[in-house]
């Protein structure tokens, strides 16, 4: 071979250009090779229910347009979508030996009469196939604008399908996918199936009955009617939307349910539509007739019914959603809630002249203290939208005071009930039904426990705060048309709280100091109660001192008193004998002094105190922390004249004094010890004359001032943890009326833990999740109660045999599952179905609920939606060809008629055929 010269120039003569369509064809063929669709596809068993899912997606470009290629394959309905069906290909040798050993899968599935209205997949219902490839535009800019473009693409696809020996049907959408205009093709090399759809907007009358559609089907095939032809097999489904008679739901307020957190619908019952899809399974041509004037399709004698109960989401929202709705930002507020409650009431509130808080802080001596109950409150209050008797009952409920006049409360509640029903006149039956419903909605569990599902940081169930939260929430519901009822109740609560404080009456339960596991408002109420307790204790001490001494005997200072005067022993402030004698005066017994209590602290006060301590220098910080010890030293010196530091340690800190060796511990002997310095500086002052460490008057007035100045938003925020806890606990109580599954119990416990975290850390996201959960659970409860009432009323009107309790509960569960599936936006699973036979007891009960016997023949003919499936085994295009099954599915609605054709042909004229 001669060597190529260095400057040799090569000339390229091949200028082949790859078109966009050729590029598309090559890419599409590569996808088919990836799927290995080059042989017969197996027929799936009819014993297993399958559903079509997208198992793979690819993108192909035609010029600047991008097409999405999706593979839809069947998986068992009960399996995980990832567990695809394994398709086993037939051996190639076997196919070549006898082409009819394994039939053309598409032909078998189109002819399958079980592919009727029992299926739920769109392509299976429309065309009768269970596996396909779908070509659709990836966005609106890449749509096929007319059938010519689709025919060009489908022509290329047909060539590829034949050359690759792929039998899987391929569909292509025309224009926008929502129009549902489809063209498709499938072939096994010998016969073909062409798929197409027709969507009609301007409805022609000839397309509106089964008889007309049958003629249209045969005309589309170009078939002449002959007595020798096999009869067409048909199936039909008529959907009837029956409005249920809806009377507005009125809450029936009673004395028994007065203190329960309200539940149930806000105004209307959940369900207002009964949807029945009556199906007649495949029957022969001419066995049933339907035309413009007559129909043999009696809904009560169909093969089976598919039942749904429908409603809008807004009508399903209940009272608890309204109660928790004030904590959502998107909730429209009826009144301004950023104002003080007294300002919201405006002219409806008579302001009370409360004593100035500073006046109570200037008490310097026992002579200025008023002993016993005093300071009767002046007449004041509100005259807002809530009647006085009802307001009094609410306040008594909050403070757990016995209602002295239940008859008056019952009268006010009856007036409230009458006012809500005055707009509509209800019949006696409707009133009875309303009372029955109210009993079910306001179920009260007599065995309800006082414990929580999780450790919420909120008020406990037996506290005033818990009852206040329920009362304020119910005020928003009981008088929803009067938004000022809530601030009115808050103002009345404060007036009663002030009155009880002045009279030193119990305002909250407190056991061992402030309970830091409760919410901030509950801690404030506990602090207020501790202030009342401290005030009572101080008054008892003063009363005791007054009775023990002559009222005219006083220990006044001598006129010659000066700095050198030696104080005489003072016996004031002694509680009891300690049991030991003084160290330096062995003959004198030692007394335990009356001491001050430490100031109880709420969480907010602890945070404020810690912040203040960190701002001080070390000396001032120690001085502040020794405040209580210094008070004890003063009390001890006053009770034990002549006592030394060692005596104080023997009582206050026994571990720092050794009785055997009579020595003080080393830590107390450190030079410049703060304890020693404090002892030397302490004066003998009994506790009655000391400055109060726990200034109950100041703290109580500060709390009451905070309450008085709070805006409605602040009040609601204080109640927030308790309201959410009360809502979740109320749902748990009403769920116990019909029982819940173990799975739901676990979900409830999980939700309770989320709420516990929300109340502890005040996380808005957790509160929103709880609000959504409570709203959903209440919806389900309302639906169940409504269905229970509907079936109970139907039982009273129907003849035996009656549906069993098990059948009714099963029906309620399935109907609720369907309604819930259609409501939640995140429902991705297949819609559940409720199938019954019309003549079964439960079917007859449904018929009574929907009053189906009252449907006229014209109502039956003009159903909300009519669907037909036509199957015809017919020789096409000529009588000499092999008979193949043709299929048409018709979907007739008020605004659109859609026809879907699966047309067979045993002739194949493609030059790529592998005959």
UniProtKB/Swiss-Prot annotation:
Which branch of life, at top level?
Eukaryota
Q: Which UniProt keywords apply?
A: Cytoplasm, GTPase activation
| Family membership noted in the UniProt record | Belongs to the Rab3-GAP catalytic subunit family.
Tell me where in or outside the cell this protein is found: Cytoplasm
Please give the chief subcellular localization of this protein.
cytoplasm
Keyword Acetylation listed? The answer is no
Protein name stated in the entry: Rab3 GTPase-activating protein catalytic subunit
List the source organism: Caenorhabditis elegans
Q: Does the keyword Cytoplasm apply?
A: yes
GO CC terms on record?
cytoplasm
InterPro entries listed in its UniProt record: Rab3GAP1, Rab3GAP1_conserved
Gene Ontology biological-process annotations: amyloid fibril formation; autophagy; positive regulation of autophagosome assembly; regulation of GTPase activity
> How does the record describe its quaternary structure?
The Rab3 GTPase-activating complex is a heterodimer composed of rbg-1 and rbg-2.
Where are the coiled-coil regions?
none
* Any one GO MF annotation of this record: GTPase activator activity
Its biological purpose is as follows: Probable catalytic subunit of a GTPase activating protein that has specificity for Rab3 subfamily. Rab3 proteins are involved in regulated exocytosis of neurotransmitters and hormones. Specifically converts active Rab3-GTP to the inactive form Rab3-GDP.
């Amino acid at each position: 071979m001669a060597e190529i010269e260095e400057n040799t120039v090569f000339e390229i003569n091949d200028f082949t250009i790859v078109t966009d369509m050729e590029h598309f064809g090559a890419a599409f063929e590569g996808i088919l090779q990836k799927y290995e669709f080059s042989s017969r596809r197996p027929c799936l068993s009819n014993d297993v229910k399958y559903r079509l899912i997208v198992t793979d997606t690819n993108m192909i470009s035609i010029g600047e347009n991008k097409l999405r290629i999706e593979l839809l394959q069947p998986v068992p309905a009960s399996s995980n979508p990832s567990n695809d069906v394994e398709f086993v290909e037939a051996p190639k040798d076997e196919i070549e030996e006898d082409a009819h050993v394994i039939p053309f899968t598409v032909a078998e599935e189109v002819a399958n009469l079980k592919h009727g209205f029992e299926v739920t997949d769109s392509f299976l219902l429309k065309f009768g196939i269970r596996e396909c490839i779908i070509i659709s535009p990836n966005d609106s800019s890449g749509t096929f604008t007319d059938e010519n473009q689709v025919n060009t693409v489908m022509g290329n696809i047909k060539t590829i399908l034949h050359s690759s020996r792929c039998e899987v049907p391929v569909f292509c959408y025309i224009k926008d996918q929502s129009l549902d205009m489809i063209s498709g093709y499938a072939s096994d090399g010998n016969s073909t199936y062409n798929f197409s759809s027709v969507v009609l907007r301007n409805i022609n009358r000839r397309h509106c009955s089964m008889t007309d559609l049958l003629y249209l089907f045969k005309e589309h095939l170009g078939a002449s009617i002959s007595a020798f032809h096999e009869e067409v097999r048909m199936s039909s489904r008529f959907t009837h939307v029956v409005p249920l008679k809806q009377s507005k739901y009125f809450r029936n307020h009673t004395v028994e349910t007065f203190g329960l957190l309200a539940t149930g619908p806000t105004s209307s019952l959940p369900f207002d539509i009964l949807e029945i899809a009556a199906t007649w399974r495949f029957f022969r041509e001419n066995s049933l007739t339907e035309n413009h004037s007559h129909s043999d399709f009696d809904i009560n004698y169909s093969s089976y019914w598919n039942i749904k109960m429908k409603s809008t989401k807004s009508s399903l929202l209940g009272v608890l959603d309204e109660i928790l709705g004030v904590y959502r930002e998107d909730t429209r507020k009826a009144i301004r809630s950023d104002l003080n409650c007294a300002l919201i009431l405006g002219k409806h509130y008579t302001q009370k002249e409360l004593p100035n808080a500073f006046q109570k802080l200037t008490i310097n001596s026992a002579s200025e203290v008023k002993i016993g109950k005093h300071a009767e409150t002046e007449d004041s209050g509100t005259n807002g939208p809530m009647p006085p008797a009802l307001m009094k009952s609410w306040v008594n409920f909050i403070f757990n005071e016995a209602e002295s006049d239940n008859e008056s409360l019952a009268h006010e509640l009856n007036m409230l009930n009458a006012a809500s029903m005055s707009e509509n006149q209800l019949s006696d039956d409707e009133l009875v039904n309303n009372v029955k419903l109210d009993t079910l909605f306001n179920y009260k569990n007599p065995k309800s426990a006082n414990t929580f599902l999780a450790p919420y940081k909120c008020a406990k169930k037996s506290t005033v705060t818990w009852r206040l939260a329920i009362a304020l929430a119910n005020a928003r519901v009981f008088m929803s048309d009067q938004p000022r009822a809530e601030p009115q109740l808050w103002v009345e609560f404060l007036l009663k709280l002030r009155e009880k404080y002045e009279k030193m009456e119990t305002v909250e339960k407190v056991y061992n100091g402030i309970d830091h596991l409760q919410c901030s408002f509950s801690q404030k109420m506990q602090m207020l109660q501790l202030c009342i307790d401290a005030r009572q204790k101080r008054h008892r001490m003063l009363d005791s001192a007054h009775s023990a001494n002559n009222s005219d005997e006083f220990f006044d200072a001598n006129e010659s008193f000066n700095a050198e005067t030696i104080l005489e022993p003072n016996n004031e402030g002694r509680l009891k004998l300690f049991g030991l004698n003084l160290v330096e005066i062995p003959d004198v017994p030692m007394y335990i002094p009356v001491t001050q209590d430490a100031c109880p602290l709420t969480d907010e006060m602890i945070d404020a105190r810690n912040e203040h301590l960190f701002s001080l220098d070390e000396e001032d910080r120690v001085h502040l922390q020794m405040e209580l010890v210094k008070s004890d030293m003063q009390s001890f010196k006053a009770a034990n004249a002549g006592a030394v530091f060692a005596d104080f340690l023997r009582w206050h800190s026994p571990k720092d004094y050794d009785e055997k060796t009579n020595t003080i511990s080393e830590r107390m002997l450190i030079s410049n010890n703060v304890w020693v310095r404090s002892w030397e500086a302490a004066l003998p002052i009994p506790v009655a004359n000391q400055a109060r460490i726990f200034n109950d008057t100041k703290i109580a007035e500060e709390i009451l001032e905070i309450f008085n100045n709070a805006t409605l938003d602040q009040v609601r925020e204080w109640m927030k943890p308790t309201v959410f806890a009360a809502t979740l606990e109320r749902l748990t109580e009403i769920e116990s009326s019909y029982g819940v599954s173990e799975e739901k119990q676990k979900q409830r416990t999980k939700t309770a833990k989320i709420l516990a975290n929300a109340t502890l850390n005040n996380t808005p996201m957790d509160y929103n999740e709880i609000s959504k959960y409570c709203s959903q659970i209440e919806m389900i409860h309302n639906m169940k109660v409504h269905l229970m009432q509907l079936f109970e009323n139907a039982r009273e009107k129907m003849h035996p045999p009656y549906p069993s309790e098990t059948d009714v509960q099963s029906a309620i569960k399935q109907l609720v599952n369907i309604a819930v599936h259609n409501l939640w936006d995140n429902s991705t699973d297949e819609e559940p179905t409720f199938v019954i036979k019309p003549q079964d007891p439960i079917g007859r009960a449904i018929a009574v609920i929907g009053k189906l016997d009252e449907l006229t023949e014209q109502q039956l003919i003009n159903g909300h939606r009519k669907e037909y499936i036509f199957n015809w085994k017919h020789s096409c295009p000529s009588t000499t060809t092999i008979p193949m099954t043709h299929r048409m599915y018709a979907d007739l609605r008020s605004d659109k008629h859609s026809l879907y054709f699966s047309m067979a042909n045993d002739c194949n004229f493609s030059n790529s055929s592998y005959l």
